Amino acid sequence: MQIVGSRPARALFFPEDEAEPVQELAYFLRRRDIPFMQLSHTTDHTVWRLGEHIRLQAFRTQHLGQEFYEVPHVCYRISFDGREVLFTADTDYLHETLAQISGTALEAAFVNPLFFQALFDKRLFHGALEAKYICVYHIPFREDDRMHMRESVRRRLTAPGAEHLRVLPLSEPYQQIKL
């Protein structure tokens, strides 16, 4: 709530959840007249227009890791200036195929390091994710990288099969990219 309170926000989207912090956020937004949408099965695949040239679609997917199966999870598809971008967050790539975006020409797909690894192994990811750029995010900072994700991503960049991909690893604080 500190971030929302200190920056101008025109609207917020977040998964519907009965957890107290989520309810407190909704209360906070109502008091400040900031529009918000709690995403649920009833909003799945709805497309929102956010200005003249921006569209947002959120669709539910399974969260990665059996211990998180009850955690509400969504992917975000954002369209702007004729480009399509997908944020997969912690989608369960072992069971999801992302058929929702099949046939979509993605400018960029944002995947976490584990999903990035799975893109190279059809035994792990059974779908197709075709994008001009694969942006690897959720890479831990050096001091937090107990599972050596940074090194794993770095090695995969030069492994067989990666030569045809345009990969943008996002691993540094405040790092910016241009698509």
Features from the language model and the residues they span:
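Active-site environment of divalent metal-dependent phosphoester hydrolases
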Residues: 1, 18-22, 46-47, 92-96, ...
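Short internal beta-strands
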Residues: 8-21, 133-140
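Binuclear metal-ion centers of metallo-dependent hydrolases, dominated by the metallo-beta-lactamase
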Residues: 33-51, 98-103, 122-179
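Core dinuclear metal-dependent hydrolase active-site scaffold
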Residues: 38-104, 170-179
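Active-site metal-binding motif and surrounding structural segment of the metallo-beta-lactamase
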Residues: 1-17, 103-110
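Hydrophobic/aromatic beta-strand patches that form the interior of the parallel beta-sheet core
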Residues: 13, 37, 57, 86, ...
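Metal-dependent catalytic neighborhoods of phosphoester/phosphodiester hydrolases
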Residues: 1-8, 23-27, 145-153
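Metallo-beta-lactamase
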Residues: 77-128, 137, 141
